[in-house]
Amino acid sequence: MANEFTQIGNIEAGTAPTTEQVDQIYEIIANAPESEQADLIKELADQYPDSGGEILSAIIEANPDDAADIAITTAEALPEAAAEVAAAVAEVVPEAATEIATQMAQTNPEAAQAAAQAIVEANPEAAAEVAIAMAEAAP
């Protein structure tokens, strides 16, 4: 599975990937068997060590129907990107953000605090709901 992302091209830290790059990366991850998706996200982070969270956030923005799957797999594979991905979820699908953050926390309790904080920062009105959900998901 190594080198899945070699044809994507360079993505500089702090620079958003192009639409074409987002589409290519999404296709690679989405078309992989579910059992390989976490490994692909890790490989993406290895290939683009300073941009992994930003790239995954761009993928969520471009594919809101898959936001939950991408966010949960990211919490499992790349917990250091959980906050950035949760913030993208809160922007793209705010009505599902608490539920998705809860699933992220159940997948990886270490990602719970960062995900919850990002959701609350993006949507302060949801603070109580997020706090209750996180307490239940990752006591």
Where are these regions (language model features)?
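General marker for long, soluble alpha-helical cores
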Residues: 1-139
